[in-house]
C-alpha cells in the first residue's frame, strides 16, 4: 500500500473506532460486535506498524498498552483534589441544605438549584487535556500531589484520547487551552467477575474498587488494558465554561466524549433531594456498577467561591452515603495483634459471611474496654458492620442467642508473639508489649511504617517481604535495610534477580527523602507527619532535636507536653540512638536542606496566625503561601505575633489580637500582600 493510501485508511479507521468507542461507552448504543471492533483495531495496528511515522498519541491503537512503567512520577495538582464531607444521616443533609441557603447572597434566589448525582465507588483521578489532547492522568494521592499514571489511563476506553470534534476541529475548539476533567475510574460488576474468574490460582480481588485501585498502579499497561475499566466524569475546569451551571458542565462533558453516568437531576427543594436519595437506594441495586451514595452540589459555580471550603472539603457540596451494610455471624475466637508501638489489639475470628460484596472472616474489636462495653463472648452470635472500605467491626451481640458454652474473652498476660509480660499504663485503655526491640511483630510493623508512602516511600517493600527479612535475620531494624545485598534478597521466596534489584533501587532512592520525613519514619509515639514538620522547622538537625531539653520541646508551636515527653524519651533510648546512627551511616538526611528560593519576601520573618474561614484558600494552602514568602504560620497568639489574618466567623483569637495590639487584616488585604 502506498503511503498516501495508508494515511487515508488510517484516518478512516481511527474515526470509525473512535465513533464506536463513543457509542459503546458513552451512549451505550453499540453498532457492531466486539469481534468486528477488534478486527478493525487489528487492521489499524498493522497499518501503523507498516508506517510507524503515522502513529499519533490519540490513535485508538495506543489504548492497547504495552508500556512498562518502572516508577510513577509524582505530579502536583493544579488545584487540590479535596474529598467531600460525607454523612449517613438525612437530617445532616437537610442541615447542609439549610446552611447553604443561609450563606448564599440574595441574588441566588429563594430556591437555588442543587444537582444530585450518583456517587460511584471507584478511584478518583484527574485528566489534563492540552489543545484537546490527553497529556496527563493522575491519581488523587494526598490531594495535593498524585502519581502520574498516564500510560494506564490511556488504556481505558471511556477516556477520550482526543476531545470530540476531530483533529481539524480540535485545534479550532480547544487550541491554546488546558482543560482538566476529574472523575472516578471503576469496574463494572460483570468485568470484575470475569477478572476474578481468570485468576483461579491467584488471590481473588475483594471487590471492584480494590481491583480498580490495584490495576491502576500496575507497571505493565498491557495488563491494565486487558482488565476492563471505565471512567465517569463529574467535574470540568475549562476557561470557556466558567459561566456555566454545574449541570451544563456535565452536559458539556458528554459533548466532549465523556461518560457521566447520566443519572443526575436538578433539585429545587429538600423534598426533591430526599426523593432522589430514596429512589436510588433501591434502584442502585439494578446497576452494573457499585455506587455507595449520592453527591449533592450547588448548581451555580458562581457561588462556590462565596461559600468557600474547609482544609478538607468544599462547603457547597456534600456526599450522602447509604447506611453501612450489616450481617449476622458467629464469633468463633479472638486473636491478639501487636502493633509497631506494642499496642495489643483484639481481633474477632468470625464464621465466614458475605458483607458488602466481600467474604468477611475477621473483624476488629478495638480494645478491651470495647469488649466489656459490648459484653461480647466467644461463641456469641454478633452483628458486624462495614462502611465503605473501613475494616468490619462488631457492633452488638444478637439478643437472646447466647449459648451456654460461650466463654468470656480474657485479657492476655503475655505478648502473643514474643511472650513478654504485658503492661497496662495508668490512664490508658490499651495494653502493651514492652519488648520493643526484640518482639518480631513490633520490628516488622516499624519497618513497614518506615517504608510507608508518607515516610521513606520504599516501593516493593510489602508485608510478606518484611516478614521474610525479619524471619531470616537479614534485618533487625529499619537501618539494616540499607545494608542489604542483591544476593541476600534474591534468595528469598518470589524474589528473582530483577525483583531484588527493583527493591534495592527503591531503598537507594529513599536516601534522598527530606529530613522531616525521616523524623516521621522513625515512628516516635504521637509524632505524625505534621508534627514531624514542626519539629524539623524548630530543630534543623536531628542532633539539635536529640539534645533538646524537655522544657524547650514543650515551647515548640503545636507540641504539647505529651508529645514533648514522647520525643524527649525517644532520644534518651539507647536503641533509638543506635538506629539514628545506622541511618546517618547510610547517608539519610538528618538535617534540613537549604531552604527553597522564596517567591518574594513580603512576609519575611513574620509570625502569622489565621483565624476563621478563608474563602480562597484552605488553612494549609494559606500557610504554604506565607512560608513561600519568608513567613511562618504559628498557632499560639502572643505579643510576638506579627499578623493575624481574619476570615469569616473568626474565633476568640481576633478579640485577643485586638487587645494585644497585634495587626489584624482581612482576606482581601492578605491576597494583596501575596504579590
Swiss-Prot record:
The keyword Transmembrane does not apply. The keyword Oxidoreductase does not apply. CDD domains: BRCT_DNA_ligase_like (cd17748), LIGANc (cd00114). Its cofactor is Mg(2+); Mn(2+). GO terms for cellular component: cytosol. NAD(+) binds at residues 34-38, 83-84, 117, 140, 184, 297, 321. It comes from the Bacteria. GO terms for biological process: DNA repair; DNA replication. PROSITE patterns: BRCT, DNA_LIGASE_N1. Pfam families: BRCT, DNA_ligase_aden, DNA_ligase_OB, DNA_ligase_ZBD, HHH_2. PANTHER family: CHROMOSOME TRANSMISSION FIDELITY FACTOR 18, DNA LIGASE. This is DNA ligase. It comes from Prosthecochloris aestuarii (strain DSM 271 / SK 413).
